[in-house]
Amino acid sequence: MAALFPPPPGPRFVLRGTQSAVNTLHFCPPSQAAGNPLLFSGSQNGLVHIWSLQTRRIVTTLNGHGGQGVIWLKTLPQGHQLLSQGRDLRLCLWDLEEGRNTIMDSVQLDSVGFCRGSILVRGQQCWMLAVPGKGSDEVQILEMPSKTSVCTLKPEADARPGMPMCLGLWQTNSSLRPLLLAGYEDGSVTLWDISERKVCSQITCHEEPVMGLDFDSQKAKGISGSAGKVLAVWSLDDQQSLQVKKTHELTNPGIAEVTIRPDHKILATAGWDHRIRVFHWRTMKPLAVLAFHSAPVYCVAFAADGLLAAGSKDQRISIWSLYPCP
C-alpha cells in the first residue's frame, strides 16, 4: 500500500568538517552577516567553526577552550562579537570585526556542567548574563561587560531542585524587570524575579532533568523537553504564575534542545534518538520527523529567515528549509 503522506524532504545541504560531535549552533544575525549568511558551530573538541552558508565551507576556526567542549554560542548586538562557553570553565568574548578572531575578554565560570548560559540585552553596550553558579543549585547573574555581580539565585533549603540544566533570561514588553526561567535536574521549571531575588512561580512538568526550554514572550507561553519522553507546554499568567497547559509524549526519550522559530510559527527539537522533530507552535501538531543523522542530535537552531540547522554526535550539521517564513 502506498504511503498516505510523502516522506519529508532531505536536508537542503550538509556541513562536514568539524571532526568532532557538534554541541551547539547559532546563526549570525542578518544585520551582522554583510550579505554572507554565517553559521557558528561549537564542538566537543573545543573548537568554534564559522561557516559560510553560501560556499558551505568553514571560513574561520576559533580555538579558545583548550580542547574542552563548547556548549553555547551567542552573538552580541553591538558589532561583530561572539560569546562562547566551554567546559574549560571559561566564557570567551570574541572580536570578529574585519576578519579578526581574537579574545577580547573572558569570564571564569564556577560550574563544569552542561548548562548553557543566557543573555539579556539591556542597552547598546551592556547586557545581563546568567550562568551556573558556584553552588550546585545556584545561578549567577552578572552585569556585562563590567562583570559586576548582580546576585546569586539560590533555591530555598527545602526545595532541592538539583542543578540548573537550562536558562532563559527575558523581560516583558511592559516592564524592564529582568526575569529568568530555569529548568532543573528534578524536572521542574522555575521563574525567578532577578530584581527581588525571589521565586515567582515553580512547576514540576517532567519526571527527568529538564534538558532544554524556550519561551515565547509574545504569547507568554513556553516549552520544555527533558531526558524523558514528554514535551511540556506551559503558560505564564498576569500574576507571573506558571501553569502546565499540555504535554506531548514522544516515541523515544531524550530531548537535548528545543527552540521556537523567530516568527513563532513552528518549533524544533533535537532528539537523542537521532531525530529532529518539528511541531506547529500554537497547536503542537507534529509536522515532520527528520531522520537524517546516525547518532544523537545535540542542538537545533533557526535563522531569521526560517532556515533550520541541526548538529549531531555524528559530526555533521544538517541544514533544512521547511515551512518557509511568509
From Swiss-Prot:
Pfam families: WD40 (PF00400). Expressed at low levels in most tissues and highly expressed in adult testis. Widely expressed in adult brain with striking regional distribution in forebrain, midbrain, and hindbrain structures, including the thalamus, hypothalamus, amygdala, hippocampus, pons. It is found in: Cytoplasm; Nucleus. It comes from the Eukaryota. WD repeats lie at residues 17-61, 64-104, 159-202, 205-244, 250-291, 292-325. The keyword Aminoacyl-tRNA synthetase does not apply. InterPro entries: G-protein_beta_WD-40_rep (IPR020472), WD40/YVTN_repeat-like_dom_sf (IPR015943), WD40_repeat_dom_sf (IPR036322), WD40_rpt (IPR001680). One of its GO terms (cellular component) is cytoplasm. GO terms for biological process: DNA damage checkpoint signaling; DNA damage response; social behavior. Keywords: Cytoplasm, DNA damage, Nucleus, Repeat, WD repeat. Its main location: cytoplasm. Disruption phenotype: Gnb1l deficiency causes lethality during early embryogenesis. Acts as a critical regulator of DNA damage response (DDR) signaling via specifically regulating phosphatidylinositol 3-kinase-related protein kinase (PIKK) family proteins. PANTHER family: GUANINE NUCLEOTIDE-BINDING PROTEIN SUBUNIT BETA-LIKE PROTEIN 1, TRANSDUCIN BETA-LIKE 3. This is Guanine nucleotide-binding protein subunit beta-like protein 1. It comes from Mus musculus. The lineage of its organism: Eukaryota, Metazoa, Chordata, Craniata, Vertebrata.
